[in-house]
Amino acid sequence: MVRFQRRKLLASCLCVTATVFLMVTLQVVVELGKFERKKLKDSNVQDGHRDVEGEPKHLEPFPEKEALALAGRTKVDAGSYPIVLWWSPLTGETGRLGQCGADACFFTINRTFQHHPMTRAFLFYGTDFNIDSLPLPREAHHDWALFHEESPKNNYKLFHKPVITLFNHTATFSRHSHLPLTTQYLEGVDVLKSLRYLVPLQAKNNLRQKLAPLVYVQSDCDPPSDRDSYVRELMAYIEVDSYGECLQNRDLPQQLKNPASMDADAFYRVIAQYKFILAFENAVCDDYITEKFWRPLKLGVVPVYYGSPTIADWLPSNRSAILVSEFSHPRELASFIRRLDYDDGLYETYVEWKLKGKISNQRLLTALNEREWGVQDINQDNYIDSFECMVCRRVWANSRLQEQGLPPKQWKADVSHLHCPEPALFTFSSPASPALRGRSLRELWLPSFQQSKKEAQALRWLVDRNQNFSSEEFWALVFKD
């Protein structure tokens, strides 16, 4: 009976807490909405754009005690919180008062808050960043922040100096970003050390009677890295089992053909049987490292890696992967892999770190230990929450500097925050499907990258002009002689 009463009391407390929190958030939304409607009614419109005059409203000091007691307040003064507006509707949140340590900000995708005097930052998702609609004119107190963890092929113009330097804050795959996402596909040290999927070497040797030494699983064919051209050439010198749509010569079980199954336990079991995995990225960029690299390491398979030129900085140990860049031709790579395939002692030097659970790379350990977000970890913020809070805390930090009569700190991205060279084409003397090799790269990726330079310059000029512009105006600049 006592236990039941305790549960009933606990449930009541939880309900009260939830109700109070909803009232707090609702009040913020209502207050902001009232202000915005009044602003729309009273403002003057000139040339189709709002005429915003006067100094932005200063943020009132937000002491830690008040921040920590936020959830217990029944009414929130909307004027006390900076607004952080997602210009890309990534989160889908129409309004949320988010707590970031001792600070709090109002996060929203509602573009009607663009000209609110408490709006301090605009957040952009790289893949969705386009010229069709930008928050212009840009006020002096408006920071721009970029979140881009995906492939550069999704939006090449971001990788050029005129565009990347438009942003004050960044969260990208580069270690030089303000919030590095380099290890975004790695849950932690434990999964690297885990032997859950490891197939003993003797069993792998027995499986070699029906399996190739190498496995390749890709369904995004002919990307900017031109990986399929390399693998096609490699196949002329060594057996490769290819399960994906690209260069396919072997079928996965029917239940594993859906791309969603790539993280399924059954798929891991199939791939873990191989000695080597061709881990080729779709683009060659510093620190752009995806699950293609981390997956074989988790499974106890040796990755044969092509992608980030800086990959050596992220290896668990010096001998944990075979780097394609160290071989002048696929023929040499094939010869080396065959040598490891026949020599158990030499092969085991590449999995020794896994068997002993010893990661010697301090850079990797430090990055995992110090990152402010987690991967599939309910006890940590995800990287989007961390990105939002980084911007929120910086907004408040500058507010406190201004309260002290000091100039605000100026943050600015540079080219190291997103660095990708021009796509390069593999050229081989042997005629391995010459009609197909590099076709899409020649016809699409190189011209796309080259045009993106012109797009970046045109966009920068228009943004610096600080007026809204049409797509016709933008493209006229891009193709101007």
Curated annotation (Swiss-Prot):
Going by the record, the broad EC class of this enzyme is transferase
Spell out which residues lie on the membrane's Cytoplasmic side: 1-8
Q: Name one GO biological process term.
A: neuroblast migration
* Lumenal topological domain residue ranges: 32-481
Entry's EC annotation? 2.4.1.221, 2.4.1.-
Under InterPro entries, the record lists: Alpha-1_3-FUT_met, Glyco_tran_10_C, Glyco_tran_10_N, Glyco_trans_10, GT10-like_C_sf
The family database entries (Gene3D superfamilies) matched by this protein are listed as:
Glycosyl transferase family 10, C-terminal domain
Keyword Glycoprotein in the entry? The reply is yes
**Which Gene Ontology molecular-function terms are recorded?**
alpha-(1->3)-fucosyltransferase activity; peptide-O-fucosyltransferase activity
Pathway involvement?
A: Protein modification; protein glycosylation
| Pfam families cross-referenced by the UniProt entry | Glyco_tran_10_N, Glyco_transf_10
Record-annotated disulphide pairs:
389-392
Annotated keywords: Disulfide bond, Endoplasmic reticulum, Glycoprotein, Glycosyltransferase, Membrane, Signal-anchor, Transferase, Transmembrane, Transmembrane helix
This protein's GO CC annotations: endoplasmic reticulum; endoplasmic reticulum membrane; Golgi apparatus; Golgi membrane; nucleoplasm
| Reaction catalyzed | L-threonyl-[protein] + GDP-beta-L-fucose = 3-O-(alpha-L-fucosyl)-L-threonyl-[protein] + GDP + H(+); L-seryl-[protein] + GDP-beta-L-fucose = 3-O-(alpha-L-fucosyl)-L-seryl-[protein] + GDP + H(+)
What residues form the membrane-spanning segments?
A: 9-31
Free-text function comment from the UniProt entry: Protein O-fucosyltransferase that specifically catalyzes O-fucosylation of serine or threonine residues in EMI domains of target proteins, such as MMRN1, MMRN2 and EMID1. Attaches fucose through an O-glycosidic linkage. O-fucosylation of EMI domain-containing proteins may be required for facilitating protein folding and secretion. May also show alpha-(1,3)-fucosyltransferase activity toward the innermost N-acetyl glucosamine (GlcNAc) residue in biantennary N-glycan acceptors. However, this was tested with a library of synthetic substrates and this activity is unsure in vivo.
The UniProt family comment states: Belongs to the glycosyltransferase 10 family.
Name under which the protein is recorded: GDP-fucose protein O-fucosyltransferase 3
Instruction: List the source organism.
Output: Mus musculus
Print the organism lineage. Answer: Eukaryota, Metazoa, Chordata, Craniata, Vertebrata
